[in-house]
Amino acid sequence: MISDINALKYKALKYKKVLLKVSGEALMGDKQFGHEYDIIKKIAIDIKEVIALGVEVAIVVGGGNIYRGINAALVGMDRASADYIGMLATVINALTLQNVMESLNIYTRVLSAIPMMSVCEPYIRRKAKRHMEKKRVVIFAGGTGNPFCTTDSAAVLRAIEMNCDILLKATQVDGVYDSDPKKNPDAKKYFTISYKDVITNNLQVMDTAAIAVARENKLPIRVFSIKEQGNFARVIQDKGEYTAIEE
């Protein structure tokens, strides 16, 4: 149920159907590997706050906290095989996030691009849209189901397929910078940047293919920090700290 106050906020919202991309690294917090459950619970609470506004939410999770296919390929592993292992890592993350969210009474469904009938539903576009219409949070796992494609590309594709109003990328920093702010204290933050400039300046916020597809389909992107509680709800209301990527 949406409260009267949240119903008024919903009417004022510009974005009523959103896709949240959560990187694997965001799930491990300050650890070097695996999951930081306090961080995952914080993310789940943020999602619950957005759902309370009446917003339909979909999520794409990465797998970099467990396995990175591109890194394995660099040391000699077959790239396609490495990418498939990375896709399996996203399923682990999706199931972990689902369990934490369900402990907070958030109705959640995991849909995987790689069929795993005993643990989650296969990805079917119409089924995913129906889940969202019923106000269930849909977590997309398995990337695109194809090697050589990043989970950023999966996020853009799923956002477009679900007719989302916007894609929000949750990271460990509060936006897009011209260099790594963790390594360069003088890094410049972009508050607004075009798709073209992201590609031209080779900014590493998302891969080129993902940005190109977002640009072609006029899908706006917001990049923000997941570390600060309540940021997700603020960003979809055009508040808080973030970088806007659009035409």
From Swiss-Prot:
Catalyzes the reversible phosphorylation of UMP to UDP. Pathway: Pyrimidine metabolism; CTP biosynthesis via de novo pathway; UDP from UMP (UMPK route): step 1/1. ATP binds at K21, V22, S23, G24, G64, R68, T171, Q172, Y177, D180. One of its GO terms (cellular component) is cytosol. Gene3D superfamilies: Acetylglutamate kinase-like. Disulfide bonds: none annotated. Inhibited by UTP. Belongs to the UMP kinase family. It catalyses: UMP + ATP = UDP + ADP. It comes from Rickettsia rickettsii (strain Sheila Smith). NCBIfam families: pyrH_bact (TIGR02075). One of its GO terms (biological process) is UDP biosynthetic process. Its EC number is 2.7.4.22. It comes from the Bacteria. It is found in: Cytoplasm. Keywords: ATP-binding, Cytoplasm, Kinase, Nucleotide-binding, Pyrimidine biosynthesis, Transferase. This is Uridylate kinase. Homohexamer. GO terms for molecular function: ATP binding; UMP kinase activity. UMP binds at G63, D83, T144, G145, N146, P147, F148, C149, T150, T151. Pfam families: AA_kinase. Its main location: cytoplasm.
